[in-house]
Amino acid sequence: MEKDKTFKYNTEIIGTTKVHSVKSDYKIRIKNEITYKGLEDDLYRFNIVESLYALDDYEDPIMTQIAEMTNRICSIYKEIEIGINAEGIIEKVFNRDQIRDKWQKVKAWLTNAHPLESYEVIRAKEFELSNEEMEIKNIRFIHFLHQYFFIFRQSVDSGGTKYIKKNEMDRFGAGVVIPVNINLREKDLENGAIERNYEGKMVRDNKVIERLRQFTKDNYMHPEYKMTGKYVYDNITLLESDFTITEELGEFYYNHSYLRLTLEE
């Protein structure tokens, strides 16, 4: 990837979420510009600017309100400059001051638009932004960033398989980190690009399962967390990706998201 060169990406997210008896389908379009800023202290520095975020479809009005608040909070990351290690993990955020300044405006909007509903949300976000380690940890789990860095620089001998362990965050706000075992495969394409495919399933960790059961108030449910993906690279430049995440916590909690990313010509 050429230093200081900007790449434009289009992302489409299609999904279904269910919480108790409320089930909603959603569709989101995102446009991002990503600039590689070079290697700094063994970290690959990237600037990411969101130029479009469109919630095209969300059926349930209550869920729409939640989505509206969530999207407004996420807007503080419309521009983010991050340092990625050789395993694709975010280790540093370079523009934290800019993010905190944006948060003050979002907090004022939340307080005026949704004073009761946003009280606990504001408290939690204030605490997170005051703690750099926690802030970086939560940014790591921003779902669309997976597309760019989930298997960044993870190479495999052609025809072979590589086994990786990753940590994922549950998608229902329980705050539970879910360990996932990944099987990664690679093949060379005729045009010189490299295609990497992976499958991932949660590790059956008893402590994690117990915390998820406490969250759902279901002592007998068996949680499932699965991931699949396909990435096409030219060196470290991502050309396209398909990414699917499915989480099911018993009868009443279900989320399935499909993310499709393409590089603009």
Could you describe each region identified by the protein language model?
Residues 1-84, 153-265:
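Acidic, serine/threonine-rich low-complexity disordered tracts
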Residues 85-88, 117-120, 259-261:
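Hydrophobic transmembrane alpha-helix bundles
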Residues 90-201:
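Acidic, serine/threonine- and glycine-rich low-complexity intrinsically disordered segments
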